[in-house]
């Protein structure tokens, strides 16, 4: 397989929405087929504050082979303090992109200036309108009996210019304070992600955002942002994640260029082909790790309590050797190193994986001794975002191999099909996700056996349903999401198996609470357990998966009154 395709597959399988137009279901091509852009107004409909659920079950199981009754997971399989919740991120759901003092983000800028780089030409100016509908969202979470809600804080909503000098936006503080208070009043624990890919555009223009070559300005500005969050929300929030999916963020923003700010090497297809896809992802990743270490150090010195936790969330695609050869086993290990170890090993032991250092060489920055000391052990919980797995097939390490993207440094292609021609698991909706719950168990065993079995939360897990202009998804079909329900049930059941094997996994968050803006896939994929009708003021409807989670969560719990302030 060509190096570019191998890297594209590695990227495309890392996160929802990054996705079908990068690689086909059989790994047959690397292409970017954009649909005709929608009207700019279509992505700016004002959503109202209505709340709707469907009380009656509709349809059948649509031919999906479900688990037998005895195999369906039950809440009492898990410890009473095991956390079940749902997850979102600020840019994907909030909307209100320029309201109440919010500054412009890199994604606002990217979508407004390069709509051709979004599959349907849309943007998240309105998103799912959660800025105005957060009370409805909390009501939904409570209705489903969720223990927790994972959401992110928009950096430019809090600091419009991204810096201390630019000032704090009091309306941004008020919004998140209101959300956190309402969650707690309803018995829902907030899990807060400080950064989920929305960089203040002012910092992009000032020093290149996370490409800051000084490795200083971005670290200082991010640490100040984290401090503002700790100062204003730390009395209520016990669980913090400094960064979400740094591997996806860096590789897609500065490698393939399909994420804001859209940079890649000359000759590749992106908005700004003036970068270096073999270097810039590593530069940005290095800055992320330095910023994480400083934020955790600050937190531990001034805000930490006995009942608080802090870490970061990794995106992990499971790996299985393509064949039985020693070379394919080595390819699997290199793939784990760049997919997981790139950001995990520095926070565990203070430095990058040995394979990455030997293969990327001078392209991978070096940590100073004092930086290694701050990095090592800079967490007391970790998040894992798991969706699917791939077969890792060896690419010979030789002078004839010319990497194109940073992920080519794994010297391994990521294959959907094994040597027998069969896929790693059943296809799920969009082409990049194949259901393979065993990969989640493999990952948890790696965390147990190799990395000391830290407290783990599955901070994202789910599938997307394709909904495009050419292949629209009827609302009834979207609500009857039995494939998603089966996927969720099987992965929750796998968590029980992993706990029985000694895993320290302590929670599970479905991705996502709501159908939302899926980055460069726009609104062409629906990942929500709750349907958002963008043609009807963003009215919410619980899908079958949400209804089952409601039954699951409330089976062994006393009901509580839903508190929703006027």
Curated annotation (Swiss-Prot):
Stretches the record annotates as Dimerization: 325-361, 394-405, 450-453
Gene that encodes it: GLU1
Domain of life: Eukaryota
GO biological process: carbohydrate metabolic process; cytokinin-activated signaling pathway
Effect recorded for residue 463 to D: Loss of activity due to impaired dimerization
Subunit (UniProt): Homo- and heterodimer.
Organelle targeting sequence: 1-54
pH-linked activity: Optimum pH is 5.8.
Activity control, per UniProt: Reversibly inhibited by micromolar concentrations of Hg(2+) or Ag(+), but irreversibly inhibited by alkylation in presence of urea. Competitive inhibition by p-nitrophenyl beta-D-thioglucoside (pNPTGlc), glucotetrazole, and para-hydroxy-S-mandelonitrile beta-glucoside (dhurrin).
Family the entry assigns: Belongs to the glycosyl hydrolase 1 family.
Enzyme Commission no: 3.2.1.182, 3.2.1.21
Positions of the catalytic residues: 245 (proton donor), 460 (nucleophile)
The protein's role, per its UniProt record: Is implicated in many functions such as ABA metabolism, hydrolysis of conjugated gibberellins, conversion of storage forms of cytokinins to active forms. Also acts in defense of young plant parts against pests via the production of hydroxamic acids from hydroxamic acid glucosides. Enzymatic activity is highly correlated with plant growth. The preferred substrate is DIMBOA-beta-D-glucoside. Hydrolyzes the chromogenic substrate 6-bromo-2-naphthyl-beta-D-glucoside (6BNGlc) and various artificial aryl beta-glucosides.
Distribution of this protein across tissues and organs: Expressed in all seedling parts. Most abundant in the coleoptile.
Lineage: Eukaryota, Viridiplantae, Streptophyta, Embryophyta, Tracheophyta
Catalytic activity: Hydrolysis of terminal, non-reducing beta-D-glucosyl residues with release of beta-D-glucose; DIMBOA beta-D-glucoside + H2O = DIMBOA + D-glucose; DIBOA beta-D-glucoside + H2O = DIBOA + D-glucose
A GO molecular function held by the record: xylanase activity
Protein's name according to its UniProt entry: 4-hydroxy-7-methoxy-3-oxo-3,4-dihydro-2H-1,4-benzoxazin-2-yl glucoside beta-D-glucosidase 1, chloroplastic
Cystines in this chain: 264-270
Amino acids binding a beta-D-glucoside: 92, 196, 244-245, 387, 460, 511, 518-519, 527
């Amino acid at each position: 397989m060509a190096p570019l395709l191998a890297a594209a597959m590695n990227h495309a399988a890392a996160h929802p929405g990054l996705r079908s137009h990068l690689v086909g279901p059989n790994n047959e091509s690397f292409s970017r087929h954009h649909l005709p852009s929608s009207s700019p107004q279509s992505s700016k409909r004002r959503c109202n504050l209505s709340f709707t659920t469907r009380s009656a079950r509709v349809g059948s199981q649509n031919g999906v082979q479900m688990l037998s009754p005895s195999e369906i997971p039950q809440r009492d399989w898990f410890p009473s303090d095991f956390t079940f919740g749902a997850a979102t991120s600020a840019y994907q759901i909030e909307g209100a992109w320029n309201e109440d003092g919010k500054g412009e983000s890199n994604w606002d800028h990217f979508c407004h200036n390069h709509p051709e780089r979004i599959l349907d030409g849309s943007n998240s100016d309105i998103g799912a309108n959660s800025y105005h509908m957060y009370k409805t969202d909390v009501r939904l979470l409570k209705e489903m009996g969720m223990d927790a809600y994972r959401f992110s804080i928009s950096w430019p909503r809090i600091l419009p210019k991204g810096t201390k000098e630019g000032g704090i936006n009091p309306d941004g503080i008020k919004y998140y304070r209101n959300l956190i208070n309402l969650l707690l009043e309803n018995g829902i624990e907030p899990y807060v992600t400080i950064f989920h890919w929305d960089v203040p555009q002012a910092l992009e223009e000032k020093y290149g955002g996370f490409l800051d070559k000084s490795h200083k300005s971005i670290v200082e500005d991010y640490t100040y942002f984290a401090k503002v969050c700790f100062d204003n929300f730390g009395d209520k929030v016990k669980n913090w994640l400094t960064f979400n999916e740094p591997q996806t963020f860096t590789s897609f923003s500065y490698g393939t260029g399909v994420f804001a700010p859209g940079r890649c090497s000359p000759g590749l297809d992106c908005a700004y082909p003036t970068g270096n896809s073999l270097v810039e992802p590593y530069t940005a990743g290095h800055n992320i790790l330095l910023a994480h270490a400083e934020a955790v150090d600050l937190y531990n010195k001034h805000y930490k309590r006995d009942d608080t936790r802090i870490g970061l969330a990794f995106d992990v695609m499971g790996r299985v050797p393509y064949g039985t050869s020693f070379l394919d086993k080595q390819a699997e290990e290199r793939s784990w190193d760049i997919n997981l170890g790139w950001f995990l090993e520095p926070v565990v032991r203070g430095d990058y994986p040995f394979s990455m250092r030997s293969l990327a060489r001078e392209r991978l920055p070096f940590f100073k001794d004092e930086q290694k000391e701050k990095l090592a052990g800079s967490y007391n919980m970790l998040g894992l975002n798991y969706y699917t797995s791939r077969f890792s097939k060896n690419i010979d390490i030789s002078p004839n191999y010319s990497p194109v993207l940073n992920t080519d440094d794994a010297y391994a292609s990521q294959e959907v099909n094994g040597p027998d021609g069969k896929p790693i698991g059943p296809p799920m909706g969009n082409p990049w996700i194949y259901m393979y719950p065993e990969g989640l168990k493999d990952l948890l065993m790696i965390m147990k056996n190799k990395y000391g079995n830290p407290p783990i939360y599955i901070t994202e897990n789910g599938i997307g349903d394709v909904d495009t202009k050419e292949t629209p998804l009827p609302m009834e079909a979207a609500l009857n999401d039995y494939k998603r329900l089966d996927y969720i049930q099987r992965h929750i059941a796998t968590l029980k198996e992993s706990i029985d094997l000694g895993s320290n996994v302590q929670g599970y968050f479905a991705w996502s609470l709501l159908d939302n803006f899926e980055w460069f896939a726009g609104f062409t994929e629906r990942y929500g357990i709750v349907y958002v009708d963008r043609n009807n003021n963003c009215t919410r409807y619980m899908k079958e998966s949400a209804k089952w989670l409601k039954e699951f969560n409330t089976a062994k719990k006393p009901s509580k009154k839903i508190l929703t302030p006027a």
